């Protein structure tokens, strides 16, 4: 099972302080573990802080976007999920059209016409060790659904959890993650 380019959707009863009601975009998943970016947890960092650090202006299309808290790992670093993939210093391709980049050059070029069409900027990332995500899935902590660029880039962050459940065709209020016993 490879969940790259999928959303992890937290079960409604997840009690983890960070991951409760989260949607995580899985950027890499292999036998060694998984790496993803939470796409619906705003950070205290502003777009102005990000772009002023590079000496660039915030692109008009991103004026009202929030910087996400991508996860509890390496919160001092920035990460950008974006289209198109492009040619950046430190990127991993997630799909044919989406990449995760951790190098500053993507931010420095984000306002240049045609360099980056859509972007989600985060600080930190989410990570699972070997077999950890598979155990959490077996324990019914998460639901999975193929990623949707509209949810990832176009829907306001506060509506992404509901949108992911809608894509699954599930009412989150009807779910119970505990195993049933007869």
UniProtKB/Swiss-Prot annotation:
Belongs to the UPF0301 (AlgH) family. HAMAP family: UPF0301. Transmembrane segments: none annotated. This is UPF0301 protein NMC1274. Pfam families: DUF179. One of its GO terms (cellular component) is cytosol. It comes from the Bacteria. SUPFAM superfamilies: VC0467-like. InterPro entries: AlgH-like (IPR003774). The lineage of its organism: Bacteria, Pseudomonadati, Pseudomonadota, Betaproteobacteria, Neisseriales.
């Amino acid at each position: 099972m490879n969940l790259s380019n999928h959303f992890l959707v937290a079960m409604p009863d997840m009690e983890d302080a960070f991951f409760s009601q989260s949607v995580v975009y899985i950027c890499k998943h292999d036998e060694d573990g998984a790496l993803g970016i939470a796409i619906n947890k705003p950070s205290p960092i502003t777009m102005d802080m990000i772009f002023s650090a590079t000496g660039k202006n915030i692109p008009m299309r991103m004026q009202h976007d929030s910087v996400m808290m991508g996860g509890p790992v390496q919160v001092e670093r920035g990460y950008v999920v974006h289209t198109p993939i492009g040619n950046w210093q430190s990127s991993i391709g997630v799909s044919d059209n989406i990449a995760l980049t951790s190098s500053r050059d993507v931010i420095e070029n984000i306002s240049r016409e045609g360099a980056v069409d859509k972007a989600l900027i985060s600080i930190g990332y989410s990570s699972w060790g070997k077999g950890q995500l598979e155990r959490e899935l077996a324990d019914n902590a998460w639901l999975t659904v193929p990623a949707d660029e509209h949810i990832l880039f176009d829907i306001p962050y506060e509506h992404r959890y509901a949108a992911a459940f809608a894509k699954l065709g599930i009412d989150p209020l009807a779910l119970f993650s505990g195993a049933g016993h007869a």
